[in-house]
């Protein structure tokens, strides 16, 4: 092994303690990257990099299949999904598999099938990953030019981008077809407390679909997270799928314009940074969606949202005290505002008390009791159905506020259940992972821009003490 400490080419790279473990083409001497730099060693080995990506996909799909089967094995049909710490079965149930009216699970076999299909797929991907990592050609450019590429080849890069966009568009249309033709999906707004139905009358009006993008992200506006009917969600997927497929065709057929060639950095690390930035945005949006939206993420499976649990508590005690003779329309609370009902800043009748801050909540168990000016007093007195009472009492005790010791629910609610809501897990994990991805985006963007500018910031290794010391071996 050459003594790396004197090779200026690697002056910015940490050195391996034991170079004898390395393989040619993947070691520090031949690539300039040590083993822990992972796929950086494969930057110019398209065949090996393909193997790494396929194997990674295999690991992802293996986790999905194994975790799916684990959740099926532990599932208890008598308890709601959100009380059982499930994060995969709620997604399958939302797609309409295995559930009936009210979100009740009537058949777990589709969940089992899903797990097995993912496990089989992961085996295929795993084999492909190992083949390309160990046996296949190191580079694809010579044998399979269609799959080969050079990072600086702008035309090839936008062609690859186009192929990816088409695949994403097909994915969006798969949801459209499932919702419209293949059995439908679960609609939490179906009359009487939710059911599986086919979504046929899609919203395709561009003013409605793109109106969501123009809404404020704050308060009762809520940007795209405020979507509350499946026609809009599935119609949005028609638009997105179409845009992705048309954009993909465009990027395959065209070469980048001069402004794009000048403005963007065209290197492997730059593409990595762009991808990490996009994933960070996805993570932050997913966090807000699963935390606030009870249409795409039905409360029957994921548990109530925070505002929903709070409003459910107010509703439950309104029902109780009204039965005990309270006049809920005029009773005053300790602050002089209405104890059960009050008016919002814009005049609607809303629940009183601390839950006033959540007055713009919309939930399927509550909307039937609203009139043109907010909550309708006559409906609250005469029209409350048993299923609405049951559901609000259940949601009241399952707020997504799990603390460190897993005591779920509102802290002052003596009936709160000992659990952590899947909404808490999914929102927190997607925020944290989105943040890590964002930091990775900044890191790799900085490195890519520095490399493109012809310098690499870092510790000046020319005068490091270690350079004058005896090599370890």
UniProtKB/Swiss-Prot annotation:
Residues bearing PTM Phosphothreonine: 15
Biological process per Gene Ontology, one example term: photosynthetic electron transport in photosystem II
Mode of membrane association: Multi-pass membrane protein
Keyword Cell inner membrane: no
Keywords of this entry: Acetylation, Chlorophyll, Chloroplast, Chromophore, Manganese, Membrane, Metal-binding, Phosphoprotein, Photosynthesis, Photosystem II, Plastid, Thylakoid, Transmembrane, Transmembrane helix
Record-annotated membrane-spanning stretches: 69-93, 134-155, 178-200, 255-275, 291-312, 447-471
Main location, first listed in the record: plastid
A UniProt-annotated Pfam family: PSII
Binding-site residues for [CaMn4O5] cluster, renumbered to this chain: 367
Subcellular location: Plastid, Chloroplast thylakoid membrane
Cofactor comment: Binds multiple chlorophylls and provides some of the ligands for the Ca-4Mn-5O cluster of the oxygen-evolving complex. It may also provide a ligand for a Cl- that is required for oxygen evolution. PSII binds additional chlorophylls, carotenoids and specific lipids.
InterPro entries xref list: PS_antenna-like, PS_II_antenna-like_sf, PSII_PsbC, PSII_PsbC_sf
Prodomain residues: 1-14
GO MF term set: chlorophyll binding; electron transporter, transferring electrons within the cyclic electron transport pathway of photosynthesis activity; metal ion binding
GO cellular component terms listed in the entry, alphabetical order: chloroplast thylakoid membrane; photosystem II
N-acetylthreonine: residues carrying this PTM: 15
Subunit and interaction comment: PSII is composed of 1 copy each of membrane proteins PsbA, PsbB, PsbC, PsbD, PsbE, PsbF, PsbH, PsbI, PsbJ, PsbK, PsbL, PsbM, PsbT, PsbX, PsbY, PsbZ, Psb30/Ycf12, at least 3 peripheral proteins of the oxygen-evolving complex and a large number of cofactors. It forms dimeric complexes.
Functional description taken from the UniProt entry: One of the components of the core complex of photosystem II (PSII). It binds chlorophyll and helps catalyze the primary light-induced photochemical processes of PSII. PSII is a light-driven water:plastoquinone oxidoreductase, using light energy to abstract electrons from H(2)O, generating O(2) and a proton gradient subsequently used for ATP formation.
Family membership: Belongs to the PsbB/PsbC family. PsbC subfamily.
Protein name as catalogued: Photosystem II CP43 reaction center protein
Organism classification: Eukaryota, Viridiplantae, Streptophyta, Embryophyta, Tracheophyta
Encoding gene per record: psbC
């Amino acid at each position: 092994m050459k003594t790396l400490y004197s090779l200026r080419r690697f002056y910015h790279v940490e050195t391996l303690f034991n170079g004898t473990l390395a393989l040619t083409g993947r070691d520090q001497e031949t690539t300039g990257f040590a083993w822990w730099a992972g796929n950086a060693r494969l930057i110019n080995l398209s065949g090996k990099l393909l193997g790494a990506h396929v194997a990674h996909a295999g690991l992802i799909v293996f986790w999905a299949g194994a975790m799916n089967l684990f959740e099926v094995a532990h599932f208890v049909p008598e308890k709601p999904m959100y009380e059982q710490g499930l994060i995969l079965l709620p997604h399958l149930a939302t797609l309409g598999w295995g559930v009936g009216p009210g979100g009740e699970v009537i058949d777990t076999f589709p969940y089992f099938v899903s797990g097995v299909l993912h496990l089989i797929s992961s085996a295929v991907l795993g084999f492909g990953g190992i083949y390309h990592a160990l046996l296949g050609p190191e580079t694809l450019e010579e044998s399979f030019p269609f799959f080969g590429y050079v990072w600086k080849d702008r035309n090839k890069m936008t062609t690859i981008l186009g192929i990816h966009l088409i695949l994403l568009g097909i994915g969006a249309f798969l949801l459209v077809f499932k919702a419209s033709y293949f059995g439908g999906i679960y609609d939490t707004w179906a009359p009487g407390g939710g059911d599986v139905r086919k979504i046929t009358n899609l919203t395709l009006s561009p003013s409605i679909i793109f109106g969501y993008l123009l809404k404020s992200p704050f308060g009762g506006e809520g940007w795209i997270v405020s979507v509350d009917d499946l026609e809009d969600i599935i119609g949005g997927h028609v638009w997105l799928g179409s845009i992705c497929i048309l954009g993909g065709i465009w990027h395959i057929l065209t070469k980048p314009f001069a402004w794009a060639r000048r403005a963007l950095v065209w290197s492997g690390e730059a593409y990595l940074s762009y991808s990490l930035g996009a994933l960070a945005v996805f993570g932050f949006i997913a966090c807000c969606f699963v935390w606030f939206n009870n249409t795409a993420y039905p409360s029957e499976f994921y548990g109530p949202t925070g505002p929903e649990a709070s409003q459910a508590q107010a509703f439950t005690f309104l029902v109780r005290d009204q039965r005990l003779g309270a006049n809920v329309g005029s009773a005053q609370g300790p602050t002089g505002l209405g104890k059960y009902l009050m008016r919002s800043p814009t005049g609607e009748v809303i629940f009183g008390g601390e839950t006033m801050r959540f007055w713009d909540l919309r939930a399927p168990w509550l909307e039937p009791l609203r009139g043109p000016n907010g909550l309708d007093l006559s409906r609250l007195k005469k029209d409350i159905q048993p299923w609405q009472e049951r559901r609000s009492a259940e949601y009241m005790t399952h707020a997504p506020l799990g603390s460190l010791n897993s005591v779920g629910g509102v802290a002052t609610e003596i009936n709160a259940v000992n659990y952590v809501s899947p909404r808490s897990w999914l929102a927190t994990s997607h925020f944290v992972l989105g943040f890590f991805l964002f930091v990775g985006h900044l890191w790799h963007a900085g490195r890519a821009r520095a490399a493109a500018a012809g310098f690499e910031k870092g510790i000046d290794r020319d005068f490091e003490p270690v350079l004058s010391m005896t090599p370890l071996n």
